[in-house]
């Protein structure tokens, strides 16, 4: 039996992080968690990490798509999407969270480049804060590790 598993130590990886500016007080922690995981655990060099800011979570799929097209030309091995969508009193949450998730998934499938989903979709600010580095860990760091592992899984499959 042949088992394929990826490792996270990927010193030569080139990784882009697309991050939403909206809810930046939470997203800044996700970004720090992602960068820390890439450098400390993944051993990714600082010069191989690119951060791209977009207005909000709804804009993430388009930016990630552009980054994956760059990846096909030797730009990036993976892209991490970071953001926070917090439920409010209107249907806006469902539209933004759903389109962001669907769009990122489509980009990953179409590009065949790892797109790690680090977008928090929470019921409250408190839940978002918990997932950005307090009680529930840092989902930015988790997304970074997912991206690194998927780089290696896909290399092993090909």
Curated annotation (Swiss-Prot):
Enzyme Commission number(s) of this protein: 2.5.1.78
Pfam families assigned: DMRL_synthase
Disulfide pairings: none
Catalytic activity: (2S)-2-hydroxy-3-oxobutyl phosphate + 5-amino-6-(D-ribitylamino)uracil = 6,7-dimethyl-8-(1-D-ribityl)lumazine + phosphate + 2 H2O + H(+)
Pathway assigned in UniProt: Cofactor biosynthesis; riboflavin biosynthesis; riboflavin from 2-hydroxy-3-oxobutyl phosphate and 5-amino-6-(D-ribitylamino)uracil: step 1/2
Keyword Protein biosynthesis assigned: no
Domain of life, per lineage: Bacteria
GO cellular component annotations of the record: cytosol; riboflavin synthase complex
Family matches, as InterPro entries: LS, LS/RS, LS/RS_sf
Gene3D superfamilies the record matches: Lumazine/riboflavin synthase
GO biological process terms on file: riboflavin biosynthetic process
Key words of the record: Riboflavin biosynthesis, Transferase
Cross-referenced HAMAP family: Lumazine_synth
Assembly information from the UniProt record: Forms an icosahedral capsid composed of 60 subunits, arranged as a dodecamer of pentamers.
Name of protein: 6,7-dimethyl-8-ribityllumazine synthase
Organism placement in taxonomy: Bacteria, Pseudomonadati, Pseudomonadota, Gammaproteobacteria, Enterobacterales
């Amino acid at each position: 039996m042949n088992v394929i598993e990826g490792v996270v130590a990927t010193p030569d990886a080139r990784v882009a992080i697309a991050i939403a500016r909206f809810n930046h007080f939470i997203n800044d922690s996700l970004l720090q968690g992602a960068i820390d995981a890439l450098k400390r655990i993944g051993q990714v060099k600082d010069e191989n990490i690119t951060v791209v800011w977009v207005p909000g979570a709804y804009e993430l799929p388009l930016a990630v798509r552009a980054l994956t097209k760059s990846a096909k030309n030797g730009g990036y091995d993976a892209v991490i999407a970071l953001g926070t969508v917090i439920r409010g009193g209107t249907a806006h949450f469902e539209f933004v969270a759903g389109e962001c998730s669907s769009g990122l998934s489509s980009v990953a499938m179409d590009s065949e480049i790892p797109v790690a989903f680090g977008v928090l979709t929470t019921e409250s600010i408190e839940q978002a804060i918990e997932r950005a580095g307090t009680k529930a860990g840092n989902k930015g760091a988790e997304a970074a590790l997912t991206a690194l592992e998927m780089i290696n899984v896909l290399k092993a499959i090909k």
